[in-house]
Amino acid sequence: MKLAYWMYAGPAHIGTLRISSSFRNVHAIMHAPLGDDYFNVMRSMLERERNFTPVTTSVVDRNVLARGSQEKVIDNILRKDTEERPDLIVLTPTCTSSILQEDLQNFVERAKESAQCDVLLADVNHYRVNELQAADRTLEQIVRFYLDRAQRQGTLPSQRTEQPSVNILGMTTLGFHNRHDTTELQRLMADLGITVNAVIPAGASVEELQHLPRAWFNLVPYREVGLLTAQYLQDTFDQPMVAIAPMGITATADCIRQIQQVLNQQGAAVDFEPFIDRQTRFASEAAWFSHSIDCQNLTGKRAVVFGDNTHAAAFTKILSREMGIHVVLAGTYCKHDADWFEAEVAGYCDRVLISDDHNAIADAIAELEPAAIFGTQMERHVGKRLNIPCGVIAAPVHIQNFPVGYRPFVGYEGANQIVDLVYNSFTLGMEDHLLEIFGGHDTKEVLTKTVSAGSDLDWKPDGLTELNRIPGFVRGKVKRNTEKYAREQGLTAITAEVLYAAKEALGA
């Protein structure tokens, strides 16, 4: 456990709550002190939910610390069972309440004796896993619980569907553009003539889980959530999985080809090559854009990519092989799956950074000075301080990345959206230069800031005057180089002469 200004992946209980609240008619009881109960507000705000978030906090207070939690937790479970009539109640502690080392499994067994619904304790180690790992584990636990019971009761369907069908796994609440991606994947499957058997967990009921084995294959669009469930279904019911994220023209085609292979291995005779060709050459604007003069203007520009495994790896490959952009750094905060990420981006970037320390990423960006950043909300903040444009491509994100309009990131429409995001993220040098020359509605004195909140150097008026004469698109670099030179020389004030000397020293 550590105190952090910024966390890329939240604590484990957030992952469990994301899964439980994604299901329909499932309630969660969170055994936690006040302060850990921010999930309800966060979900209601970001997802703009019309309904109350189905999470209740069983508050750990001084009475609980004195008498123990059993009576209070069981009472809360039974009360919610009576009030909400859920199909399932999931009990989860937080990393804080786990310190009490209480036997919550015993509480669950006691509650089962009186509850009308099923009751589960989330099987997650809150000290060892983060939000994404906990979400993946909780989804697999719930699916396994209901399928194992259906097997014991003999109620599992014994045959696959007549026509090719798919389970889409890992679509959750608070996921990055998950709602739009779900719609786009359903459209893509319909275009391929594949029936969507289930979308788990978003909007699904636990009663639907027993029908999962009927699908011909499982699609896992995000590596972070759904992989454990797909592995369980593959091992137990011999259901193949497709785990290629269909982001970008090339990866979408690769995903469709793997789906074709999986279906044909099971007796179908499908050929999706004409569909891929038609979408790539005529329907999608992304492929056309990659041959345009606009895309050629981006060739060789330097970019930094950072995010979760799925989005960071996908964007690194899109920028490099589809747009000709030079990725100087590709990174992820998913340290638990670093080997996969390094293998995926090998050959597409100069350097790989595996870290969940936002300062390490910020320092790398400041050092590399790319033309654009593609990262999370934190990299967006870093970009603002350094005057480097940033496109947000992965969680964690703020409200503006839960758009009301339709903005998927997967499939062919997602490829179009990615093109817009990438192109609009780069600042064209002439644009800033013309604003400097002719002015505009929002002209103001702009000085690029460093990563640090403050500076120990004093810019004198004549130094600032000279700095403002430098075109905006290189001004930030000149300012940072001048400050670096001043520190090396032991100077505390920067005048015009110091700026000239710095330029001379750098050979500019």
UniProtKB/Swiss-Prot annotation:
It holds the Pfam family PCP_red. Pathway: Porphyrin-containing compound metabolism; chlorophyll biosynthesis (light-independent). Binds 1 [4Fe-4S] cluster per heterodimer. The cluster is bound at the heterodimer interface by residues from both subunits. Substrate binds at G429, M430. Keywords: 4Fe-4S, ATP-binding, Chlorophyll biosynthesis, Iron, Iron-sulfur, Metal-binding, Nucleotide-binding, Oxidoreductase, Photosynthesis. GO terms for molecular function: 4 iron, 4 sulfur cluster binding; ATP binding; metal ion binding; oxidoreductase activity, acting on iron-sulfur proteins as donors; oxidoreductase activity, acting on the CH-CH group of donors, iron-sulfur protein as acceptor. CDD domains: Pchlide_reductase_B (cd01981). Its cofactor is [4Fe-4S] cluster. The keyword Zinc-finger does not apply. GO terms for biological process: light-independent chlorophyll biosynthetic process; photosynthesis, dark reaction. Signal peptide: none annotated. Its EC number is 1.3.7.7. [4Fe-4S] cluster binds at D36. It catalyses: chlorophyllide a + oxidized 2[4Fe-4S]-[ferredoxin] + 2 ADP + 2 phosphate = protochlorophyllide a + reduced 2[4Fe-4S]-[ferredoxin] + 2 ATP + 2 H2O. The active site is at D294. InterPro entries: ChlB/BchB/BchZ (IPR050152), LI-POR_suB-like_C (IPR013580), Nase/OxRdtase_comp1 (IPR000510), P-CP_red_C (IPR042298), Protochl_reductB (IPR005969), Protochlorophyllide_Rdtase (IPR016209). The keyword Zinc does not apply. Belongs to the ChlB/BchB/BchZ family. Component of the dark-operative protochlorophyllide reductase (DPOR) that uses Mg-ATP and reduced ferredoxin to reduce ring D of protochlorophyllide (Pchlide) to form chlorophyllide a (Chlide). This reaction is light-independent. The NB-protein (ChlN-ChlB) is the catalytic component of the complex. PANTHER family: LIGHT-INDEPENDENT PROTOCHLOROPHYLLIDE REDUCTASE SUBUNIT B. Protochlorophyllide reductase is composed of three subunits; ChlL, ChlN and ChlB. Forms a heterotetramer of two ChlB and two ChlN subunits. This is Light-independent protochlorophyllide reductase subunit B. It comes from Synechococcus elongatus (strain ATCC 33912 / PCC 7942 / FACHB-805). The gene is chlB.
